[in-house]
Curated annotation (Swiss-Prot):
Name of the gene this protein is made from: rimM
Protein purpose: An accessory protein needed during the final step in the assembly of 30S ribosomal subunit, possibly for assembly of the head region. Essential for efficient processing of 16S rRNA. May be needed both before and after RbfA during the maturation of 16S rRNA. It has affinity for free ribosomal 30S subunits but not for 70S ribosomes.
One Pfam family per UniProt: PRC_RimM
Name of the protein this chain belongs to: Ribosome maturation factor RimM
Major subcellular site: cytoplasm
Subunit structure of this chain's protein: Binds ribosomal protein uS19.
Family from the record: Belongs to the RimM family.
GO BP: any one term: rRNA processing
Keywords of the record: Chaperone, Cytoplasm, Ribosome biogenesis, rRNA processing
InterPro entries registered for this protein in UniProt: PRC_barrel-like_sf, PRC_RimM, RimM, RimM_N, RimM_N_sf, Transl_B-barrel_sf
Location(s), subcellular: Cytoplasm
Gene Ontology CC terms: cytoplasm; ribosome
NCBIfam families to which the protein is assigned, alphabetical: 16S_RimM (TIGR02273)
Segments forming domain PRC barrel: 102-182
Length: 182
């Protein structure tokens, strides 16, 4: 693992995955990827982690698929004990590396914190998380404190055209055709 801050720390950091448990005795680690295709996480370099509030560059020596898992070998990490120190570290890259999206496609990171409002003007709350369900993505919306329907959280499908009527990332606003009581 490189102790240098070279390459530069990401200006626009985004978490693409997480280092999991150790694998074997030679310093390998499992990796949990948040990219659509799990192996795509290796297309984005350099990797960084934060430990005790400090950025560290992580240089990969090797990676491979093992059964259903992805495992990595980090340069300079040669035993289980050293690898154990990296367990649960988030894998961070600069978001400027992500490809441009087509119209009506959004990165989840860009939707976080957006206010969700119905077509009738009712404020449902803010997006705090996104979930993948297989058939479609779902917004997890934290309701406003004084929600008229007593809701704390809502799950709203991210179906463009059907439910999602307008997304304005500049205004941090998503307009939906959704019953606030549901």
């Amino acid at each position: 693992m490189s102790k240098q801050l070279n390459p530069a720390v990401p200006d626009q950091p985004i978490v693409l995955g997480k280092m999991g448990s150790t694998y074997g005795i030679r310093g390998w680690l499992r990796v949990f990827s948040s990219t659509e295709n799990a192996e795509s996480i290796f297309d984005y370099q350099p990797w960084f982690i934060q430990q005790a509030g400090k950025w560290q560059h992580v240089e990969l020596e090797d990676w491979k698929r093992h059964s259903q898992d992805l495992i990595i070998k980090v340069k300079g990490v040669d035993d289980r004990e050293a690898a154990n120190l990296l367990t649960n570290c988030e894998i961070i890259v600069d978001s400027t590396q992500l490809p441009a999206l087509e119209e009506d496609d959004y990165y989840w990171k860009d939707l976080m914190g957006c206010q969700v409002v119905t077509t009738t003007g009712y404020e449902l709350g803010k997006i705090i998380d996104m979930m993948e369900t297989g058939s479609n993505d779902v917004m997890v919306v934290k309701a406003n404190l004084k929600d008229a329907f007593g809701m704390k959280e809502r799950l709203v499908p991210f179906l463009h055209g059907q439910v999602i009527k307008k997304v304005d990332l500049t205004a941090q606003r998503v307009e939906v055709d959704w019953d606030p009581g549901f």
